[in-house]
Amino acid sequence: MLLQFRTGTNSDIPQLQELAIKSWGEYEKVLLPDYWIKLFSNISNPDTYSELLEIAHCEVCTNEENTIVGMAFLVPSGNATEIYEASWCQLRFVSVDPSYNGQGIAKTLTQKCISLAKQQNEQIMALHTSEMMDKARHIYESLGFTILKEIPPRFNKKYWLYTLTI
């Protein structure tokens, strides 16, 4: 199976939406219906991706048919939110098509974002993840991310803020 990595663009938005729905669909089983509806409306909204693409680098993984099977966004420092400091870059929306799980795609996407952050002289990379994202937490911890603190629950689930000194 030939997998390739490239920069994602606005023309990829329909595939990014489709991938997110596939990837995040597993959480429908563990979220209360109201929370799933809220999450689904975010991941299925094209504006979610167009707004990220305005400020962030998008790294995608494609299969031999050029279908996007993985994505991650690197938001540069200077984009503070209620949980991210302005001096941090952010790793966002790491997602993999479930039929491609276990092939190292999420880890490679994360490593590519770390490498790009180093090239851009970022100092700290941050991300948030939850108790329902065991596989993701394992990948992040294996790459050196550590829990900075627990943040207020989202979707009635525990969430943590992780950081990595670059």
Segments from the language model and where they lie:
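A short helix-loop-beta-strand connector motif used in the catalytic cores of GNAT acetyltransferases and
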Residues: N45-V60, Q90
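Conserved N-terminal entry element of GNAT/NAT acetyltransferase domains
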Residues: M1-P14, E18, K22, I166
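Conserved acetyl-CoA-binding loop-helix of GNAT-fold acetyltransferases
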Residues: V96, G102-S115, H138-S142
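Residue-level recognition of the GNAT/N-acetyltransferase active site
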Residues: R92, D97, N101, S130
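C-terminal "cap" of GNAT-fold acetyltransferases
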Residues: K22-S23, E59, S87-C89, Q123-A126, ...
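Conserved beta-strand in the GNAT
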Residues: V60, T67-P76, Q90, S95
